[in-house]
Amino acid sequence: MTENNEETIVPDEQCNLTSSTPMKSSDLENVESPIERKISIVECDGEGNPPIESSEETPPDLTSHSVAPRRRRSPRRPEVSASRLPLKVLNQIFQYLSLKDLRSAMLTCHSWNNALSMEDSDIWQQLLVQKLPEAAHSDPFLFVELRSARKKLRAWYFAWNTNDISRNNYIRTNGFTVHRQPVAQSTDGVRGKRGVSQGVHAFDITWDGPLGTVAVVGFATKHAALHCVGYIALLGSDDQSWGWNLVDNVLMHNGVQLGVYPKMNNPPKYEVGEKIRLVIDCDMHVAYFERNSEFLGIAFSHIPPLRLFPAVCAVYGNTEVTMVYVGSPQMG
């Protein structure tokens, strides 16, 4: 007989229990999780075959991401337009610009154009004080034809060139008068700072002191000579210059005398201190002179389209010639 307290041993097969033998790590790798099993079912087609791989990537699910909160915008600051700057502010800015930049500023907007169109405004007054020598400011006869600060400043940029001058000449402290030193057997000339190639331009020339045997006023290219030995009409002696000798009233170009000017019998001689106005019309390719506001007729025609500079040449010692650019002459 068996004892009642003996435990009945039931086989594992009847309890559907697995063996208590521990599983190996290799066995765990072969076990599919429910999630993997679900994925494998989805990835298979109806016949149990894996689906065809697609080159298109599945777009990300944006619904699962939280939307970042919007940043609070700062209050809009009022924008300051350069075209609405006060005139006092523009004056402080424009005084540091060159004439070329000022011209560009005039084409920028109506406000800047109006500020710079006032020829006697504080802008031009300040620039005039900065650029113009004190000797020119104090000369009461230098700017008789020029009233505004803008025109005076423009004349300064067209004055005699200290770097384009014969070695026997020098420019006085006012910047507009050339002085010839007493050197024997020498003809000496000078050119203006800026040349002209289009438009109509007028230059007032005044000869102070004796003329000597040669005293020529006119214009030349950048290549014309400004010094030679002897006393000759240097301005007009080659094809790069055109001149009018005030001593004998003869026009010269390319070494040829073109006749007496003005074309009349016994034309009056030049008197020291008279104002001679040289007018170069680059559009019509002609040039002429005026004496005391009197038109003397066309002096030169068929002038080639070159950049032309006002010029003079002298031979008499200690004589002086003043030249002031006045812009476009008054017609009629």
UniProtKB/Swiss-Prot annotation:
Q: Which organism is it from?
A: Caenorhabditis briggsae
GO annotation, cellular component aspect? neuromuscular junction; neuron projection; presynapse; SCF ubiquitin ligase complex; synapse
* Task performed by this protein: Component of a SCF (SKP1-CUL1-F-box protein) E3 ubiquitin ligase complex which is required for the restriction and/or maturation of synapses in GABAergic neuromuscular junction (NMJ) presynaptic neurons. Promotes NRJ synapse development and synaptic transmission by negatively regulating the daf-2/InsR pathway in muscles. By targeting convertase egl-3 for degradation, negatively modulates insulin-like protein ins-4 and ins-6 processing. May stabilize synapse formation by promoting the down-regulation of scd-2. Regulates axon termination in PLM and ALM neurons.
Family membership noted in the UniProt record: Belongs to the FBXO45/Fsn family.
Known SUPFAM superfamilies for this protein? Concanavalin A-like lectins/glucanases, F-box domain
* Region Disordered, annotated ranges: 1-81
Major subcellular location class: other
Q: Which CDD domains match?
A: SPRY_Fbox (cd12907)
Cite the InterPro entries for this sequence: B30.2/SPRY (IPR001870), B30.2/SPRY_sf (IPR043136), ConA-like_dom_sf (IPR013320), F-box-like_dom_sf (IPR036047), F-box_dom (IPR001810), FBXO45-Fsn/SPSB_families (IPR050672), SPRY_dom (IPR003877), SPRY_FBXO45 (IPR035784)
Any signal peptide, and if so, which residues? none
GO molecular function terms listed in the Swiss-Prot or TrEMBL record:
protease binding
**Protein name stated in the entry:** F-box/SPRY domain-containing protein 1
Which segments constitute the B30.2/SPRY domain?
Answer: 138-330
